Amino acid sequence: MGQLLSFINGNDHTEQIFIDFEHAQPSDDERELHKTVNEVLIRGPAIIDKLLAYAGCNEFIRRAITNPGPETEDAAWEAVLPSVDQLQEFYDFSLELETCFPKLLVALCKNDPKASLSNQQALAKQLADIFDFVLKFDDAKMVNPAIQNDFSYYRRTLNRMKLTKKDANIKIRDELANRMSLFFAYPTPMMKVLSETTVKFLSQDTTVPRDNVTTALATMANVCHDMVEKKKFTQDDLNMFCLRAMVGSIILFDHIHPQGAFVKKSPVNIKPCIVTLKDSNTQSSPGLLNALRFTTIHLNDVDTPGAIKQLLLLD
């Protein structure tokens, strides 16, 4: 998957960076961090599979609400408990991402970020892997209302069950339930975790300049766009990987750059990125476009060109 990637930035200066997303192996300097991050990422596909298979407890909850009584309410509670345990697994995974993501930012952004992306390709691949996971998760979560419905029912029923013999079965109590509720209430919870984690990281770690992080994200977005636009790959899954990494980079850039990703002089080639995403016309494209529309924070700023707003907001 390694290709020579070229893009022209806002200053019309051509950059050429080799990134081998398919075959990149960690160097000795990368190995320890790569192993740490990989121990988290390797579980990502199973998390996505469980989320896609999440059917929810709608029928049990409906019966308990429309025909309340010990039998229907106990049945709903017993159905919801294992589902909520699964939701906790999703939430706990977000905490692991919250821990490992700043470590990647330090490695890739402490020094020249473009050189770091080129010279630490295994870590650059992991950055793209995180964006790929986050956009997959959020896209699947957004179209599954059973997740929030199940957890809302759990919280409503929690206090009553704490007063009964069912108390012994309760693993997720008030404080954790409150944190999980905030997590699942957000339309794109995993991306929210990344953006909040990055903002917090930049406010606390003075060794990594903010400009280095935004440069790394703009570079990642532009080269991923270039890979798709120049038809480097025929496999749909590789193109979608690049598009998710591109969109994730743009969203995070928009959250931490003072002017955001959409201004005329943005280092992100935002118009070509949007055009390529719309032209991709895949099953996942609408979800990625919605992520750009609703998860970014600067799209509706007065400095955003009208043509960009129209391009993104109109189908």
Swiss-Prot record:
Belongs to the CYRI family. Signal peptide: none annotated. Disulfide bonds: none annotated. GO terms for biological process: regulation of actin filament polymerization. GO terms for cellular component: membrane. May negatively regulate RAC1 signaling and RAC1-driven cytoskeletal remodeling. It is a lipid-anchor. InterPro entries: CYRI, CYRIA/CYRIB_Rac1-bd. GO terms for molecular function: small GTPase binding. Keywords: Lipoprotein, Membrane. This is CYFIP-related Rac1 interactor homolog. It is found in: Membrane.
